[in-house]
């Protein structure tokens, strides 16, 4: 069996923790094909070094707009969010979803100040979904699973890859070998496929 001590933090903070020796694995996510000059590329490239780090494919997942049941404001894009003045709830600096949002805003020709509530943030996908469910926000960007778990609607925006990063030197550790073997099993692949918005790599 593989036993994990899991700490939840944003993608950027997770990789920093890896580089500072505070963890063995760091999870982070990027678009399937991030542009070379994207904020994601500029954020993660300095933190990950070829030859020092190893990336392990973990999952594909969908990120999108988390909205109230029935999508009462008719939000289907970030343009809609900006144009409608919908109350948005963000993720904090250091989270991969904040990096993603800023990239998507730039692609859409939008600025942070175009989004009502851009400065308001919650620490997790679940907390964003809870804010929408409670009515303190109209919309946030997050994963489909968080929306479905709270009975909310979800508007897909992008496909991502979720990666696990480790140091090359950790690959021979028995626990790391066991984890990599587990990720290849059909049981794991089926479990991943059963989660809303997730798919195995």
List each model region and its residues.
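Hydrophobic residues within well-ordered alpha-helices
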Residues: 18-19, 101, 131-133
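Short helix-loop capping/hinge motifs at secondary-structure junctions, enriched
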Residues: 70-76, 110, 169-175
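N-terminal segment of the mature folded domain
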Residues: 1-76
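A ligand-binding cleft/hinge motif common to bilobed small-molecule-binding domains
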Residues: 29-44, 129-158
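Periplasmic-binding protein-like
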Residues: 49-62, 152-181, 183-199, 201
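Short loop->beta-strand "edge-of-pocket" segments that line small-molecule binding or catalytic clefts
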Residues: 79-99
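Short beta-strand-to-loop elements that line the ligand-binding cleft
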Residues: 3-10, 112-124
């Amino acid at each position: 069996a593989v036993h994990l001590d899991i700490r939840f933090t944003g993608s950027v903070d997770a990789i920093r923790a890896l580089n500072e020796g505070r963890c063995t694995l760091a999870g982070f996510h990027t678009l399937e094909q991030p542009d070379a000059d994207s904020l994601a590329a500029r954020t993660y490239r300095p933190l990950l070094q070829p030859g020092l780090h190893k990336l392990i494919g973990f999952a594909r997942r969908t990120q999108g707009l988390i909205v109230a049941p029935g999508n009462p404001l008719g939000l289907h894009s970030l343009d809609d969010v900006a144009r409608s003045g919908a109350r948005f709830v963000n993720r904090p600096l250091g989270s991969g979803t904040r990096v993603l949002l800023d990239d998507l805003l730039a692609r859409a020709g939008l600025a942070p100040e175009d989004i009502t509530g851009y400065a308001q943030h919650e620490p997790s996908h679940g907390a964003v979904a809870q804010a929408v469910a409670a009515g303190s926000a109209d919309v946030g960007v997050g994963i489909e699973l968080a929306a479905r778990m709270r009975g909310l609607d979800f508007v897909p925006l992008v496909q991502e890859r979720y990666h696990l990063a480790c140091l090359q030197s950790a690959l021979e550790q028995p626990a790391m070998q066991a984890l990599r073997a587990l990720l290849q099993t059909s049981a794991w692949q089926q479990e991943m496929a059963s989660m809303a918005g997730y798919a195995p790599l």
